[in-house]
From Swiss-Prot:
This is one of the proteins that bind and probably mediate the attachment of the 5S RNA into the large ribosomal subunit, where it forms part of the central protuberance. In the 70S ribosome it contacts protein S13 of the 30S subunit (bridge B1b), connecting the 2 subunits; this bridge is implicated in subunit movement. Contacts the P site tRNA; the 5S rRNA and some of its associated proteins might help stabilize positioning of ribosome-bound tRNAs. One of its GO terms (biological process) is translation. NCBIfam families: PRK00010.1. One of its GO terms (molecular function) is tRNA binding. The keyword Cytoplasm does not apply. This is Large ribosomal subunit protein uL5. Belongs to the universal ribosomal protein uL5 family. Gene3D superfamilies: 3.30.1440.10. InterPro entries: Ribosomal_uL5, Ribosomal_uL5_bac-type, Ribosomal_uL5_C, Ribosomal_uL5_CS, Ribosomal_uL5_dom_sf, Ribosomal_uL5_N. Part of the 50S ribosomal subunit; part of the 5S rRNA/L5/L18/L25 subcomplex. Contacts the 5S rRNA and the P site tRNA. Forms a bridge to the 30S subunit in the 70S ribosome. HAMAP family: Ribosomal_uL5_B (MF_01333_B). PANTHER family: 60S RIBOSOMAL PROTEIN L11-RELATED (PTHR11994).
Amino acid sequence: MAARLRTKYKKEIVPELNKKFKFSSIMQVPRLEKIVLNVGMGEAHTNPKALEAAVEELALITGQRPVKTKAKKSIAGFKIREGMSLGCMVTLRGDYMYEFLDRLVNVALPRVRDFKGVSEKGFDGRGNYNMSIKEQIIFPEIKVDKINTLYGINMTFVTNSKSNEEAYSLLAAFGMPYRNQK
């Protein structure tokens, strides 16, 4: 069974965006290619258990095992050596991506305290959107009483659109709650 948002994309969003931007083919309609989640933990070199907990929690959130990210260079001021594990990341594609986006928009973001919407300033000019959350506990898969450290998660939504406006419309059609909805 296909993910709910994938079905919505094919049946509702593609015709809507094709009509709005007047593409000559439906293959020109922007689509979500992947979502990359990244956790950077500065304390990982002094507390390896915190990184292991972050890996397990990110696996719970996404349904996919993250890969540990390693330092590219040694930095003496931060007591970091080349090859040290400093964080973890996961790349979501296909049904995992659509399921995660569905949970993020409909469950996790509304659980953020004093949530007014996500910023529109996260677009990079090439149709990709970056955002971050301050605490991982907004996801229902995370049990608050088993948390040792709070950390933020950076998310990058990669689309094949050519402009920010197309990517904005695509994510808004998926239900992304922007602060000043256009």
